[in-house]
């Protein structure tokens, strides 16, 4: 696995150390994920991962599974097991800005998620569509192409892209099931959007 820079490696090492001291029974109950034979089983974007405890290791029956080679994604999963909680029932979707602390983080979020999605996928709508379909996402009738993903447990995300033209640049929108606002901190919602885009991009 390649580590791109210290900004990825240092946070991962911090949470890996905290993970070793985790109470696995408490984490399993709080997050709603199974723990057996020294391993948590977590499903992210339709792929099952086994996370070994207390000496961290991640594995999957899918050799090309995205998180196996993406350190920020692994850090996100560690944070979920350390601080997250099982999804509450969801009644709908919200934009990032509509959720708590969304206004404060909207600048980084726009750059890391919306602008990146717009220029990564808005210029390649058909490839975006094919990648989402290959990932098992559900097509929705919004945007030039739009899909709904089961992100993690009962947390869902929708992503819509709009192709640019001579007058307007490409654009995008990402919606979160409203249980994200109680299940994740604002910075983790930014990372969730980043992970979704990176995972789709890996399938282009």
Question: Where do the PLM segments sit?
Answer:
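Charge-rich alpha-helical segments
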Residues: 1-18, 28, 37, 55-57, ...
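Short, charged/polar micro-motifs that form catalytic or ligand-binding hotspots
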Residues: 63, 67, 118, 145, ...
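Intrinsically disordered, low-complexity regulatory segments enriched in Ser/Thr/Pro
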Residues: 47-75, 162-187
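Amphipathic, interaction-prone secondary-structure segments
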Residues: 27-53, 138-163
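Ampiphathic alpha-helical segments that act as solvent-exposed interaction surfaces
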Residues: 66-90, 177-204
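Conserved binding-pocket/active-site segment within a compact domain
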Residues: 122-182
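Short Lys/Arg-enriched alpha/beta "domain-start" segment
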Residues: 1-38, 73, 80-135
């Amino acid at each position: 696995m390649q580590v791109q820079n210290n900004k990825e490696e240092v946070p991962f090492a911090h949470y890996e150390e905290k993970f070793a001291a985790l109470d696995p029974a408490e984490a399993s109950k709080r997050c709603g994920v199974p723990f057996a034979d020294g391993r948590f089983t977590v499903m992210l974007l339709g792929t099952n991962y086994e996370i070994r405890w207390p000496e961290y290791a991640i594995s999957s029956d899918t050799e090309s599974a995205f998180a196996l080679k993406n350190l920020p994604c692994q850090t996100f999963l560690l944070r979920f097991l350390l601080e997250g909680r099982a999804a509450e029932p969801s009644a709908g979707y919200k934009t990032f800005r509509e959720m708590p602390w969304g206004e404060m983080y909207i600048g980084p979020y726009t750059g890391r998620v919306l602008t990146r999605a717009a220029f990564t996928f808005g210029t390649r709508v058909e490839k975006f569509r094919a990648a989402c379909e290959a990932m098992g996402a559900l097509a929705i009738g919004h945007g030039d192409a739009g899909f709904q993903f089961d992100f993690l447990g009962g947390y869902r995300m929708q992503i819509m892209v709009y192709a640019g033209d001579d007058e307007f640049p490409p654009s995008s929108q990402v919606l979160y099931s409203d249980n994200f606002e109680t299940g994740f901190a604002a910075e983790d919602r930014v990372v969730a959007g980043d992970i979704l885009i990176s995972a789709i991009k890996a399938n282009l």
